[in-house]
A protein has these predicted regions:
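Conserved segment of the thioredoxin-like fold in thiol-based oxidoreductases
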Residues: 94-152, 158-169
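Short loop/turn segments at secondary-structure transitions that flank enzyme active sites
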Residues: 32, 117, 161, 235-237
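Local sequence-structure signature of Cys/Sec-based thiol-disulfide redox active-site neighborhoods
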Residues: 41-121
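Secretory targeting signatures
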Residues: 1-49, 80-82, 90, 296-328
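Short, conserved sequence motifs used for protein processing/export or organelle targeting and
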Residues: 127-148, 154, 170-305
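Proline-centered helix-kink/hinge sites
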Residues: 30, 98, 152-153, 303
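Long, contiguous hydrophobic alpha-helical segments, chiefly transmembrane helices and signal peptides
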Residues: 81-85, 96, 152-157, 231
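Generic hydrophobic alpha-helical membrane-span motif
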Residues: 94, 190-194, 310
Length: 328
């Protein structure tokens, strides 16, 4: 056998095997793309104009005995965040809160409930700052789906996945929420710190400092990731028997939201008075955003639906043409 014939035979084997390999890759890509599409149909993107979410949060309880404290965590250790837009008259919100309870179970999460405030005759919680936090972050996405920037109930997991109303996309609302919770945060490398240098429980004045490192991770490799730090004040439980949805004790009530200037600094804040009890916590929440990318985002296990088209083109190109077969 001549060397030329050997090379020709080898090339023929490669030509026969390569389409089979491409078909296998095509099937894998199609299957995974379909699975991801089915999963993501359970929710809406919580942000518009680019990728974004919540890296996580740090939480510190501010009791009458608290005078100072510090928390430092790597981004990978930060607690996942579930944000809920609700109202004390919202009957459907009772359904969603029970579903969240069941989906979360014993998982370690920070829940933050935004109560309707603007043009609100009943609900006593929240303020203009909490409304601003919700609308500036999720208002555009909510408007795109519902025509309104504030809809009770709305539930957002990790600042990325928004669920509206009570109609499930799968077998149940609990299943939707469990899937969304298990999808997890977008991972980054870095760390954040919150320090309360002094706190006077009588004047409610808190001196604090914060730091968040510029992240590295899948969303920051090809684009500039922008971080925004927020200081939130959340009451663990607030009793309001006059709420017409009958909950009575409203949990995780957000009383104030402060957008911090930069990723490192010091400040003085007026801690909101608890509605009742002594159970207000300060939360440092880190938002991330990055410009839209041409492809499909970081959640795709392969380079997205476009890979199917690309592999198909390669496959067709490798098939012997009819003209060549007739001439041999």
């Amino acid at each position: 056998m001549t060397r030329k014939h050997s090379i020709s035979q080898y090339s023929g084997i490669v030509v026969r095997i390569t389409p089979l390999m491409l078909v296998a890759l095509l099937l894998v890509a199609s299957t995974q793309a379909a699975a991801t599409s089915e999963q993501s149909s359970m929710w809406h993107d919580a942000r518009t104009g680019g990728d974004g979410g919540v890296i996580g949060a740090l939480e510190m309880t501010l009791t009458n005995e608290t005078t100072e404290g510090e928390i430092t965590l790597d981004y990978s250790e930060m607690t996942p965040v579930i944000e809920v837009y609700t109202a004390t008259w919202c009957l459907n919100c009772v359904t969603t809160e029970h579903a969240i309870d069941e989906a979360v179970g014993d998982s370690d999460v920070i829940r933050i409930h935004y109560h309707r405030h603007r043009a609100e005759p009943e609900d006593p919680f929240g303020n203009n700052a909490t409304e601003h936090r919700w609308e500036s972050t999720y208002g555009d996405a909510s408007t795109a789906e519902t025509g309104m920037s504030r809809v009770a109930p709305s539930t957002v997991f990790d600042g990325e996945r928004m669920h509206l109303g009570t109609s499930p996309s799968s077998s149940s609302l609990v299943s939707d929420y469990s899937t969304s919770l298990n999808a997890g945060q977008t991972s980054f490398t870095g760390s954040a710190r919150l320090t309360v240098t002094s706190y006077d429980s009588e004047t409610r004045l808190m001196q604090f400092s914060w730091n968040a490192s510029q992240p590295s991770g899948p969303e920051s490799e090809d684009s500039t990731t922008i971080l925004t730090a927020w200081l939130l004040f959340v009451e663990d439980s607030a009793s309001f028997p006059d709420g017409s949805n009958g909950i009575g004790d409203y949990l995780h009530v957000l009383h104030d939201a402060i957008e911090l200037d930069g990723l490192d600094g010091t400040g003085l804040a007026q801690v909101p008075t608890a509605w009742d009890g002594d159970d207000v916590s300060v939360v440092l929440l880190i938002d991330w955003t990055s410009p839209s990318m041409d492809c499909c985002g970081s959640n795709w296990p392969l380079p997205g639906p476009g890979i199917v088209t690309t592999l198909t083109c390669f496959l067709v190109a490798l098939l012997p043409s009819r003209r060549k077969r007739l001439s041999t």
